[in-house]
Amino acid sequence: VTLDLPFAAVVVADFEFEFGGRDGERPRPVCMVAKELRTGKEWRLWRGQFGSVPPFPIGQDTLFVAFNASAELGCFRALGWPMPKRILDLFVEFRNHVNGLLSERGLIDALNYFGLDALDAREKKEMRDLVLGGGPWSEAQRRDILEYCARDVAALERLLSVMAPHLDLPRALLRGRYMAAASAMEHNGVPIDVPTFALLLKYWTEIQDELIAARQAGATSERRPLTKGHSP
């Protein structure tokens, strides 16, 4: 079915990554497995082997396929890689396909929905926890993590084969462009006034107490702006 897609190459990819022990930080890629479906060529890269550009094509004539692509594209950004030109996110397309019908829309849910062999949920969690632990990993653990990543790629290949006939490709590619934008938002974070935020954290208890007192008194008053060195 993938051969019917109007692209010279179709690349399915998955990253494993961790956050340096701090949730919310930028991803730190651990490994990547990718497969070009027309030729069957596969790439397996471990941390330190990534290089300055992806090892596979990402131009206009290549379809880049992922599940929840903002995560994979976040790894692209962390590595300084350019964005793929054509992106298909099967997570987004599955959500669109079952909109209003299912509340669970992860990779295992998508595979089960289409009657495909799915990964074991317990094993998936164990491997994800192993990766998020941040290492160091033994040689055996490295092999296991890469093999786990490769199984996700194989699962995506199966999922693409059954979802391809349901795709509204022009709109799907537009949604893929949005996931690239979402990865930029996640990479850059939300800009905030850090000094004022620090003051809020420092005086939060006092602020709450004064607001409660004002509420109980039925009164409101002008509040002076928070400035460094002054409590509210």
For the regions a language model picked out, list residue spans one by one.
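Flexible, charged surface loops at secondary-structure boundaries
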Residues: 3-7, 55-61
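Short glycine-biased active-site loop of nucleotidyltransferases that positions the nucleotide triphosphate
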Residues: 22-25, 102
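Conserved "right-hand" nucleotidyltransferase catalytic core of DNA-directed polymerases
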Residues: 1-16, 25-26, 31, 40, ...
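Short secondary-structure capping/turn segments at boundaries of alpha-helices and beta-strands
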Residues: 18-21, 53-54, 62
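Active-site-proximal helix-loop-helix substrate-binding element of RNase H-like nuclease domains
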Residues: 30, 34, 38-51, 61-164
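Ser/Thr-glycine-rich phosphate-binding loops at phosphate-binding pockets of nucleotides
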Residues: 15-22, 68
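Glycine-rich loop/turn
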Residues: 49-56, 218-221
